[in-house]
């Protein structure tokens, strides 16, 4: 392919690979499991293409194999394929389990991000709409009413000295889910801002918690804090 424009994004690289190797890569829909070591095969097959580099190939391949549609295709009994679509061995159980955990963690991250965004929107909405002061009643004018004398100004008491802020309690990461109890208050790590939650169920695959927003989800121990 001569005079091809330079590819600038992972999405463009994946589309390029899907066009070049349609029996291996797909631009949309469920993806097929790839042969182990396929990166080296890619380098050898596209080394004459001036519009793509090894770094771009590696980055695009990493994105492709971590996408939800690829992880959905990692199932027991599925066959890995090479660049030409030839089967290269059945998936092993450990690889299927690893993909399942990756998919679960990706879903949890998305749910937590959505919950954090909703909480932020609520906070911004409350801050942007301050309460209107209640309208006072207008005084009724009358010729027979004597004007009231101005009240003497009262001296305001001196403000009390500010108290030192209470120290922020440090949180501890959960290392063993057997330490948790149903109904226990806990925090779920979402970036730099942990979110309050309550333990609803303790299962083998993780801990089901309910966020303060009402959203329930299953979280792995490494995402929890006391």
Curated annotation (Swiss-Prot):
For region Disordered, the annotated ranges are: 111-167
Pfam families per the UniProt record, alphabetical: ProQ, ProQ_C
**Do the record's keywords include Ligase?**
no
Matching InterPro entries: ProQ, ProQ/FinO, ProQ/FinO_sf, ProQ_C
Q: Which GO terms describe its biological process?
A: post-transcriptional regulation of gene expression
GO cellular component terms listed in the entry, alphabetical order? cytosol
Q: Which keywords belong to this entry?
A: Chaperone, Cytoplasm, RNA-binding
Q: Of which family is this protein a member? A: Belongs to the ProQ family.
What does this protein's UniProt record list under function?
RNA chaperone with significant RNA binding, RNA strand exchange and RNA duplexing activities. May regulate ProP activity through an RNA-based, post-transcriptional mechanism.
Q: What is this protein called?
A: RNA chaperone ProQ
Task: Report the gene name.
Answer: proQ
């Amino acid at each position: 392919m001569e005079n091809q424009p330079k590819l600038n994004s992972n999405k463009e690289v994946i589309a390029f690979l899907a066009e070049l190797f349609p029996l291996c890569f797909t631009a949309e829909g469920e993806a097929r499991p790839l042969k182990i070591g396929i990166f080296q095969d890619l380098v050898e097959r596209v080394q004459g293409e001036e519009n793509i580099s090894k770094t771009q190939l590696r980055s695009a391949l990493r994105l492709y194999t971590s996408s939800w549609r690829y992880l959905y295709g990692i199932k027991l009994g599925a066959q890995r394929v090479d660049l030409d679509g030839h089967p290269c061995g059945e998936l092993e159980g450990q690889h299927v389990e690893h993909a399942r955990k990756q998919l679960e963690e990706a879903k949890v991250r998305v749910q937590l991000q959505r919950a954090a965004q909703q909480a932020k929107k609520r906070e911004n909405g409350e801050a942007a709409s301050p309460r209107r002061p209640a309208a006072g009643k207008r005084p009724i004018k009358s010729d027979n009413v004597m004007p009231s004398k101005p009240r003497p100004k009262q001296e305001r008491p001196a403000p009390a000295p500010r108290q030192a802020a209470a120290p922020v309690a440090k949180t501890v990461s959960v290392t063993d889910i057997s330490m948790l109890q149903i109904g226990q208050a806990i925090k779920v790590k979402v970036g730099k801002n942990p979110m309050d939650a309550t333990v609803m169920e303790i299962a083998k695959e993780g801990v089901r918690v309910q966020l303060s927003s009402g959203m329930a989800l299953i979280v792995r121990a490494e995402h929890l804090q006391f």
